Amino acid sequence: MLLCSKKLLSIVASITLLGSYGMVAAQTNAGSRTNTPQAFNPQDPYNPRGTLLLRSPLNQAPVIAPNGPTPETIVGDPAYGAFQRGWYLTALALATRQAQAGITSSKTLLGVLYESGKGIPRDLPLAASWYELAASDGDPQAALRLGLLYLSGAGAELKADPEKAAEQLEKAAAANIPEALYNLALLHQEGKVRPNDPKIIKSLLERASETGDIDAMLELGIYLKDGPQEIRDPRRAAFWMGRAARRGLVPAQIYYATLLFKGEGVVPNEAEAADWFERAAAKGNPIAMNRLARIYANGRGRPIDTIEASAWQFHAGRQGILDSKLEALSKSLSLEQQEQASKRAAEIGIKIGASPVLQPKQ
């Protein structure tokens, strides 16, 4: 069982908020989902059979973990303050002086500056060297960043080294940093430099989930649902998917809706499933739009409403989710009904930021 796919973050573009990383895209694999299901039954919201990809937290200056070194407290660190204000050359000068004086957080900040290329030429080997110094001092955030650099690599400039990545991620995972726990689960899943042990993978994802990491919650739910038989637990899978759904993660909302609809790990509740599909559809997810359209077309979880079904499927179809039965339903509408569906689709389009135009049947 492979855990579901993640977006690979660009480290250059991700320097605004520490700990904020790429969620599963709201339309994961939507473009490839053009086949029409044979029977009405909400399916998986996206293909969970891909491979976990690197998730990077490199989004601002480093924050020292509670059990990490705290030289002079980072709040009063002038280099950190300059970085946050966008004064990168000032931050570089201050951090260099402080790093030479042995301040660990400044070594990590230098790594961030050289890795991101903010205000200076990007230099990944130099970034790695500063991270290594800070990690040796005991900074788990530096260990995380160094581990992610070795995990992804950068061609000839910095070769990927999964073994070194695992070593550093283990240091960061010991401080319960969710990105480290998540990516360490990746390495165990791959089974090359660390054993593919379902119990270890489950434990790492559980620890990441318990920190409040919603992506890990979804991954854990998928793993408990579809992973190796020895660790499967439908009820716990539904629990974690539901928790991620309630925190706003769109793919989790679709997964949880599917579980509610089918009664897997939870008491069947088609009406509640419809509510979750609608939440995800309102955020622009085409898979959810299609599932909601089916619900309206078949009267399961909501009263039959061919106008709503046609309007929602219009938007799903525009994003590549084709459904021959729903398309046939739309074509069977009277001219008046098509006009109503067009008006409703326009209302939905405003809500989700699209500009639909349905042409009435001639």
Where are these regions (language model features)?
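Terminal, low-structured helical/coil segments at or just beyond the last alpha-helical repeat
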Residues: Q38, T51, S56, V63, ...
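Short helix-capping/linker turns of helical repeat alpha-solenoids
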Residues: G68-V75, G86-W87, Q100-T104, S116-K118, ...
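N-terminal leader/linker segments that initiate helical-solenoid repeat arrays
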Residues: M23-T108, A354-Q362
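Alpha-solenoid helical repeat scaffolds
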Residues: T96, P125, E132, E170, ...
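TPR/TPR-like alpha-solenoid repeats
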Residues: L113, A134, L149, A172, ...
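Hydrophobic face of amphipathic alpha-helices that form TPR/SEL1-like repeat modules
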Residues: V75-G81, L109-S116, G147-A154, N183-E190, ...
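Bacterial N-terminal signal peptides
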Residues: S10-S20
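Structural signature of tandem alpha-helical TPR/SEL1-like repeats
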Residues: R85-T90, P121-W130, E157-Q168, R194-L204, ...
